[in-house]
Amino acid sequence: MSWQTYVDEHLMCEIEGHHLTSAAIVGHDGTVWAQSAAFPQFKPEEMTNIMKDFDEPGFLAPTGLFLGPTKYMVIQGEPGAVIRGKKGSGGITVKKTGQALVVGIYDEPMTPGQCNMVVERLGDYLVEQGL
């Protein structure tokens, strides 16, 4: 299965009539493996900072998580495994696997819990596959 298929069918899937605003699978080095059409352009240092927060949980808390034009307030995640961010009625979930970051961005009417479920389910599957 291609990385784009994972994004299109597993991240951008419909959940109770709603779906993520955008999603991507990005290598630990910041290289985009696959993304949805609306996924924001981001700066390399934004991915570097996300990776640093996985290595040093709490690194992003003082400054926020930046991805493209958006700044998210970092909220409770799972140290070393999941980073969650909030902005207004939307937010972001980033799940780290052995080789990649699975990123989902949502806005109302999708809920944070639905975003977490979609992103973490694919992330957990990739971890099980050794990816």
Swiss-Prot record:
UniProt keywords, alphabetically: Actin-binding, Cytoplasm, Cytoskeleton
Main location: cytoplasm
GO MF, any single term: actin monomer binding
InterPro entries named in the record: PFN, PFN_euk, PFN_sf, Profilin_CS
Listed GO CC annotations: cell cortex; cytoskeleton
Membership in a protein family: Belongs to the profilin family.
Quaternary state and interactors: Occurs in many kinds of cells as a complex with monomeric actin in a 1:1 ratio.
PANTHER family referenced in this protein's UniProt entry, alphabetically: PROFILIN, PROFILIN-A
Name recorded for this polypeptide: Profilin-A
